[in-house]
């Protein structure tokens, strides 16, 4: 088995809904009977839970992805880097005495690709978040060479953030295959005009607009999205 649908989910900033949209993607895939796996490439911010086997660290985003997928992965593959401190990844890694190696993340992805029919890889923070002194998430995306889905957090300033992110994706030789408008600020004035401005300027299709949800559940978000235009999206 080798995955035929693969994508890298990035965003215009941190805390703008990458994980919710990634879980919505996974939900849609699972609903079509696809064996779908998820990788949270780098997770910064974890809580220790005591179990019979000892102390186990959990990250909310990584757990949400695992719950939405239907291919069960070892933690080491699902989250190549699970960092304890909730801060910039390179800082969290340094505090933990860890060096984030893009080659290791790619190796995990290659293994997971053989275990599933679809793989959703979620980045960390925005598209150019430092992972080390020499690499950032853009370098990771380029190394994985996956089509990119961009989550735009709808709030003041999102036009500039979205257009700069799209330019950075193109500068890495990557293909932006779709974008999602996710409402971060429910009181944002002229939100529809902002979405229209982006739709006129981005070559990739708009996959949908997600309102501010009371509970950011995968099925609830997926109801506002249409992924059928994505490359290699499985036929119903």
Curated annotation (Swiss-Prot):
Active site residues according to the UniProt entry: 40
Entry-linked PANTHER family: DETHIOBIOTIN SYNTHETASE
Name the record gives this protein: ATP-dependent dethiobiotin synthetase BioD
Catalytic activity, EC: 6.3.3.3
InterPro entries named in the record: DTB_synth_BioD (IPR004472), P-loop_NTPase (IPR027417)
Gene Ontology biological-process annotations: biotin biosynthetic process
Entry cofactors: Mg(2+)
Natural source organism: Janthinobacterium sp. (strain Marseille) (Minibacterium massiliensis)
């Amino acid at each position: 088995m080798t995955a035929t649908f693969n994508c890298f989910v990035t965003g215009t900033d941190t805390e703008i809904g990458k994980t919710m949209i990634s879980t919505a993607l996974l939900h849609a895939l699972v609903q079509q009977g696809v064996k779908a796996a998820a990788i949270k490439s780098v997770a910064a911010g974890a809580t220790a839970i005591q179990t019979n086997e000892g102390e186990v660290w959990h990250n909310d985003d990584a757990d949400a992805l695992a719950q939405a997928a239907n291919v069960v992965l070892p933690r080491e593959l699902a989250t190549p880097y699970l960092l304890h401190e909730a801060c910039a990844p390179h800082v969290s890694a340094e505090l933990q005495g860890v060096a984030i190696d893009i080659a290791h993340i790619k190796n995990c992805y290659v293994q997971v690709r053989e275990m599933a029919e679809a793989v959703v890889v979620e980045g960390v923070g925005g598209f150019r978040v430092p992972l080390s002194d020499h690499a950032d998430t853009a370098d990771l995306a380029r190394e994985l060479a996956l089509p990119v889905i961009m989550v735009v957090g709808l709030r003041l300033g999102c036009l500039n953030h979205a257009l700069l992110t799209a330019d950075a994706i193109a500068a890495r030789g990557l293909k932006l295959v779709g974008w999602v408008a996710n409402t971060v600020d429910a009181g944002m004035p002229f939100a529809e005009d902002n979405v229209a401005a982006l739709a006129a300027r981005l070559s990739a299709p708009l996959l949908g607009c997600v309102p501010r949800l009371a509970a950011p559940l995968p099925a609830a978000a997926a109801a506002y999205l249409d992924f059928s235009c994505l490359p290699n999206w499985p036929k119903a």
